[in-house]
From Swiss-Prot:
Enzyme class: transferase
A GO BP annotation: cardiolipin biosynthetic process
Disruption outcome: Knockout mice have severely reduced cardiolipin (CL) (diphosphatidylglycerol) in mitochondrial membranes.
Described purpose of this protein according to its UniProt entry: Catalyzes the synthesis of cardiolipin (CL) (diphosphatidylglycerol) by specifically transferring a phosphatidyl group from CDP-diacylglycerol to phosphatidylglycerol (PG). CL is a key phospholipid in mitochondrial membranes and plays important roles in maintaining the functional integrity and dynamics of mitochondria under both optimal and stress conditions.
Localization terms from the record: Mitochondrion inner membrane
Superkingdom of the organism of origin: Eukaryota
Entry's Gene Ontology molecular function annotations: cardiolipin synthase (CMP-forming)
Organism this protein belongs to: Mus musculus
Keywords: Lipid biosynthesis, Lipid metabolism, Membrane, Mitochondrion, Mitochondrion inner membrane, Phospholipid biosynthesis, Phospholipid metabolism, Transferase, Transmembrane, Transmembrane helix
Signal sequence bounds: none
Gene this chain is encoded by: Crls1
The protein's name: Cardiolipin synthase (CMP-forming)
Family that this chain belongs to: Belongs to the CDP-alcohol phosphatidyltransferase class-I family.
Amino acid sequence: MLAWRVARGAWGPLRVALRPPGARLGRGGSRRALLPPAACCLGCLAERWRLRPAAFALRLPGAGPRTHCSGAGKAAPEPAAGGGGAAAQAPSARWVPASAASSYENPWTIPNLLSMTRIGLAPVLGYLILEEDFNVALGVFALAGLTDLLDGFIARNWANQKSALGSALDPLADKVLISILYISLTYADLIPVPLTYMIISRDVMLIAAVFYVRYRTLPTPRTLAKYFNPCYATARLKPTFISKVNTAVQLILVAASLAAPVFNYADSIYLQILWCCTAFTTAASAYSYYHYGRKTVQVIKGK
């Protein structure tokens, strides 16, 4: 009998500590009120039961001020049924707003990995050209072109593979690849210096514009961690039609210049005509970005 009274005396504080928000203790509804609610993670379970440090000296993983589960769309916890007033509502400061959670995206998509592969192949191609190993360079360049075709095809046909990071990473990979190729081919006397200077100048200005757009579209406070976080999407870039044509013409010139020493047509008039076409599309592409300006940038809402 003494042990039973001690057990009943210890159960009282535990019932208060484990009481869900808004539940009333009584003979009829005490057992139903103490049934644990359906929780999707330990963080949600700790939040709903309101475990008090005075009763339990423990901290469940995920019970901190982070998002529970995915965190998307949970601006405030739902009050328990039967409760009223401010006592039945949990503080909303522990939840991440839906607008902030929706700005995060998965950067590890297949198109993004293909774009990073293309960036990694660029110095390999430059080394092969400097060593005048044009046969192997043609094969590596074909592989880089295949990654360019695949990442665009996958991003267009699978919605979960499209990302704001990819809209900037794909043209950045093209510019890194083209810049290294043109510098290497100019060193090998296969492309004239003025054409390479025009292409590099345009790409440097576009890359600087991308960094500026990234800075302007970040919500305050702007931090370096947020600026260089690839998961935090703020804007999508939309290339112009003439820019796509220009990229294709530049890559055609690279392929023709790589094949020129192999098939002995380095002094062909057709190659020189291709130089002029590339210069024209490069200048037209630079003007299109200057003319359309903000139309090429789509700011993601909710920032």
